[in-house]
């Protein structure tokens, strides 16, 4: 008998419902989705709305409203719950509020007997991923945050627009905090087989333009929040990408919130931060210790130290 894959979503807000919709319309891998939210009517409404579209799907998926007991046999628990970033707020402003929320959620999930993989998308995601690891006492490879996957997607979109190529031909990452202290790996970036440094040498693009592109990446969330109140479609797709990579054992390299403990020159320890890692059915197979330039390593340390300064204030 084929194994039936089950995902539980905690959080039926904009991000959670966008992920649920993305998972539903591309549901070849997941057989059951349970949605949990403290706002029970909202979660029930999302379940009803999704179920009413079953006739239009290639394959039906069982979608239900539930509670933490439903996590006991889940393969993956996705957490998108928590307070959202408001106009003028940084993601780090949410640390204290969302840590309290996460303690209750993670305790509830683990008490069910859940032994699968956590995927965290709530902000500040790097810190909330660390918080989940601490409160769950799970091994680090079974706790994953969305990290800089969305930032990287934004970067590749902007570069693809600039060079008039498909995003699949852009090989570049945003690393560090999912937030203002992130950095682009310009020194390692390639457009197809050609390095970005070659394009700069040819005069095709200038470094000042690259600075502007990175600023667009960093400010993208603020722009979307200003225009429509919140970001959720793109990150919903990003969560689905991570979930699919786990369910189908893809060994896919993604810049998730990875647990760093001595990689990248042994300067960064005991922290979750955006860095490329291999995602598989066990969660994280390996955090890739890429050789990055000295100037990028310095940015990585600055970003890590900023996150660490917030983590050190949390009492576990």
UniProtKB/Swiss-Prot annotation:
Active-site residues, record numbering mapped to chain: 178
Coiled-coil intervals, chain numbering: none
Keyword annotations from UniProtKB, A to Z: Allosteric enzyme, Cytoplasm, NAD, Oxidoreductase, Phosphoprotein
GO cellular component: cytoplasm
Swiss-Prot/TrEMBL catalytic activity: (S)-lactate + NAD(+) = pyruvate + NADH + H(+)
Cystine pairs: none
Residues that bear Phosphotyrosine: 222
Matching PROSITE patterns: L_LDH
Subcellular locations according to the entry: Cytoplasm
Molecular function terms, GO-annotated: L-lactate dehydrogenase activity
Amino acids binding NAD(+): 15, 37, 42, 68, 82-83, 121-123, 146
CDD domains in the record: HicDH_like
Pathway: Fermentation; pyruvate fermentation to lactate; (S)-lactate from pyruvate: step 1/1
GO biological process, one term: glycolytic process
Activity regulation, short description: Allosterically activated by fructose 1,6-bisphosphate (FBP).
Main location: cytoplasm
SUBUNIT field: Homotetramer.
Record-linked NCBIfam families: L-LDH-NAD, PRK00066.1
Family the UniProt entry places it in: Belongs to the LDH/MDH superfamily. LDH family.
Protein name per the record: L-lactate dehydrogenase
């Amino acid at each position: 008998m084929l194994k039936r894959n089950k995902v539980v979503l905690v959080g039926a807000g904009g991000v959670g419902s966008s992920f649920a919709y993305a998972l539903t319309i591309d549901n070849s891998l997941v057989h059951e989705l349970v949605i949990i939210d403290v706002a029970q009517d909202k979660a029930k409404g999302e379940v009803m709305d999704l179920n009413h579209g079953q006739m239009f799907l290639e394959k039906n998926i069982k979608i239900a409203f539930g509670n933490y007991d439903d996590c006991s046999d889940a393969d993956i628990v996705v957490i998108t719950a928590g307070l959202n970033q408001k106009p003028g707020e940084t993601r780090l402003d949410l640390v204290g509020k969302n840590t309290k929320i996460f303690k209750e959620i993670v305790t509830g999930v683990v008490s069910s007997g859940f032994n699968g993989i956590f995927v965290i998308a709530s902000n500040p995601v790097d810190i909330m991923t660390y918080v989940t690891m601490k409160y769950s006492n799970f091994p680090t490879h079974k706790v994953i945050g969305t990290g800089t996957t969305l930032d990287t997607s934004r970067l590749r979109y902007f570069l693809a627009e600039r060079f008039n190529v498909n995003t699949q031909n852009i090989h570049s990452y945003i690393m560090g905090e999912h937030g203002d202290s992130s950095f682009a790996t310009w020194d390692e970036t390639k457009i197809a087989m050609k390095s970005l440094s070659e394009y700069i040498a040819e005069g095709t693009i200038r470094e000042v333009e690259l600075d502007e592109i990175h600023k667009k990446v960093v400010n993208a969330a603020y722009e979307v929040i200003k225009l429509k109140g919140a970001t959720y479609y793109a990150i919903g797709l990003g969560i689905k990408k991570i979930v699919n990579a786990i369910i189908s054992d893809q060994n896919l390299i993604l810049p998730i919130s990875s647990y760093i403990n001595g990689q990248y020159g042994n300067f960064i320890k005991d922290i979750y931060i955006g860095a490329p890692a291999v995602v598989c059915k066990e969660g994280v197979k390996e955090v890739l210790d890429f050789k990055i330039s000295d100037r990028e390593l310095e940015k990585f340390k600055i970003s890590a130290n900023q996150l660490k300064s917030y983590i050190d204030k949390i009492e576990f």
